[in-house]
UniProtKB/Swiss-Prot annotation:
Signal peptide: none annotated. One of its GO terms (molecular function) is ATP binding. It comes from Proteus mirabilis (strain HI4320). Its cofactor is Mn(2+). Disulfide bonds: none annotated. This is Phosphoenolpyruvate carboxykinase (ATP). It is found in: Cytoplasm. It catalyses: oxaloacetate + ATP = phosphoenolpyruvate + ADP + CO2.
Length: 539
């Protein structure tokens, strides 16, 4: 299966030698054979399920390993990367010396040497002008399958002239014995070198490290060119109107952007340039815990031949128990985006977004179901990236847990968060886009805002009804909230009205305002952040 132009000798430039065979851009049928062939053991082995998809296990790493993420600090990155050891904000961009990088690289290249290797060339980014051409090198068939699903698959013609911009070498089977002496976190590593344009993976089998690794790189390169790089879902209406949905896990990002009246551009990673909004990916990576055909027919229907399940429980008859989270609650499936019917074709991109929606699930019962944001408030709430979860009852704790994640994706930011906020607002202002804060969480009744009301709110945003509505100002947070919207229970629009005693809201609002102010302090080390404090909550 050696395709013209790629031989074992071509991989020697990366330090990999004595390769017995290169399996280049394998077909799905060949990957199926390789994943299920007799003799495979451990985490290399794929299991055929009754749905037609292959299931694999990723071992102890059932999610990303943020404590093992490093970026080489050199002349290219020293003054651009948002470093973990600088400033007030916490992030995962730990610096790595060029010397330690060389050691890690030699571990991975030795691991891959002397083997049959799978090489997948793919694009990250649907826009030809700004996409990254990525070459993935691995000895494990299902890892090649994962990136074939998740990244954009080139045509045969595009492959003939494919010169990679970035190399990902996945040495999941190797670990670093010298990590303590090198001052690293553990024997596992996910390391990036922006001068060499290489990502190295060692010790972790989790497929998402390759997906989110390239997202972190797009988050480095694009904003420096004035292009927004966003952790969001996006869809488009029949008239070409584009909406983007930001939100942390559990806020309804996937649910609310999956709309039978609108076509999906993508579910997780997007850019926004002079032409409009475009998907970075060629697939979806959906959570499957408690998945049912009735509740999420699109995702369930996508789990068929060529889909790849991770860490699910497969029963003796080949059926999948999606309710069993004994391996992890973070069970996943990757599949090519065309497994979903209602998508933008043939390329996952559309025009400029006119509606930008920040989803939050406020468990404190303070924020309104919807508010219209000013450009300054847009930056403030984008940088705050707030959501909150109800505490687990098993520990008997009733206090909600707040989460603040810059730009609704702090784990993947390579530059300072204010750079993403500035680029987003510039893009919005250039095309007259409007931002809204939508709370899918709880209010004074103690119940979660109904999905019916939330969907009606999203409809009012998308069809423009909200922009015609009368508004009032919610105190403390100074948010413009509508007094009435079609199809929405008017009694919930002002969160104070959901409390039997409005003084209760006042107390909770002051408490949450303090948390916002305290969190935002980390951005006051830049002039942009300092200026935005004036639009934050005021007690």
């Amino acid at each position: 299966m050696n395709v013209k132009g790629l031989t074992p000798k071509d991989l020697e430039q990366y330090g990999i030698h004595d390769i017995s065979e290169v399996i280049y851009n394998p077909s799905y049928d060949l990957l199926f054979e390789e994943e299920t062939k007799p003799g495979l053991t451990g985490y290399e082995k794929g299991t055929l399920t009754s749905l037609g998809a292959i299931a694999v296990d990723t071992g102890i790493f059932t999610g990303r390993s943020p404590k093992d993420k490093y970026i080489v600090r050199d002349d290219v990155t020293r003054d651009t990367v948002w470093w973990a050891d600088q400033g007030k904000g916490k992030n995962d961009n730990k610096p790595l010396s060029p010397q330690v990088w060389a050691d890690l690289k030699s571990l991975v290249t030795e691991q891959l040497s002397g083997k049959r290797l799978f090489v997948v060339d793919a694009f990250c980014g649907a826009n030809a002008d700004t996409r990254l051409k990525v070459r993935f090198i691995t000895e494990v068939a299902w890892q090649a399958h994962f990136v074939k699903n998740m990244f954009i698959r080139p045509t045969q013609e595009e492959l003939e002239n494919f010169t990679p911009d970035f190399i990902v070498m996945n040495g999941a089977k190797c670990t670093n014995p010298n990590w303590k002496a090198q001052g690293l976190n553990s024997e596992n590593f996910v390391a990036f070198n922006l001068t060499e344009r290489i990502q190295l993976i060692g010790g972790t089998w989790y497929g998402g490290e390759m997906k989110k690794g390239m997202f972190s790189m797009m988050n480095y390169f694009l904003p420096l060119k004035g292009i927004a790089s966003m952790h969001c879902s996006a869809n488009v209406g029949e008239s070409g109107d584009v909406a983007i949905f930001f939100g942390l896990s559990g806020t309804g990002k996937t649910t609310l952007s999956t709309d039978p009246k609108r076509k999906l551009i993508g579910d997780d990673e997007h850019g926004w340039d002079d032409d409009g909004v475009f998907n970075f990916e060629g697939g979806c990576y959906a959570k499957t815990i408690h998945l049912s055909k009735e509740a999420e027919p699109d995702i369930y229907g996508a789990i068929k031949r060529d889909a790849l399940l991770e860490n699910v429980v497969v029963l003796a008859d080949g059926s999948v128990d999606f309710d069993d989270g004994s391996k992890t609650e973070n069970t996943r499936v990757s599949y090519p985006i065309y497994h979903i019917d209602n998508i933008v074709k043939p390329v996952s991109k559309a025009g400029h977004a006119k509606k930008v929606i920040f989803l939050t699930a406020d468990a404190f019962g303070v924020l309104p179901p919807v508010a219209r944001l000013t450009p300054e408030q847009t930056q403030y709430h984008f940088l705050s990236g707030f959501t909150a979860k109800l505490a687990g009852t098993e520990r008997g704790v009733t206090e909600p847990t707040p989460t603040f994640s810059a730009c609704f994706g702090a784990a993947f930011l390579s530059l300072h968060p204010t750079q993403y906020a500035q680029v987003l607002v510039k893009r919005m202002q250039a095309c007259g886009a409007q931002a809204y804060l939508v709370n899918t969480g709880w209010n004074g009744t103690g119940k979660r805002i109904s999905i019916k009301d939330t969907r009606a709110i999203i409809d009012a945003i998308l069809n423009g009804d909200i922009d015609k509505a009368e508004t009032q100002t919610l105190p403390v947070f100074n948010l413009a909230i509508p007094t009435a919207l079609p199809g929405v229970n008017s009694e919930i629009l002002d969160p104070r009205d959901t409390y039997a005693d409005k003084a209760q809201w006042d107390v909770k609002a002051d408490d949450l305002a303090d948390r916002f102010v305290k969190n935002f302090d980390k951005y006051t080390d830049t002039p942009v952040g300092q200026a935005l404090t004036k639009v934050g909550p005021k007690r």
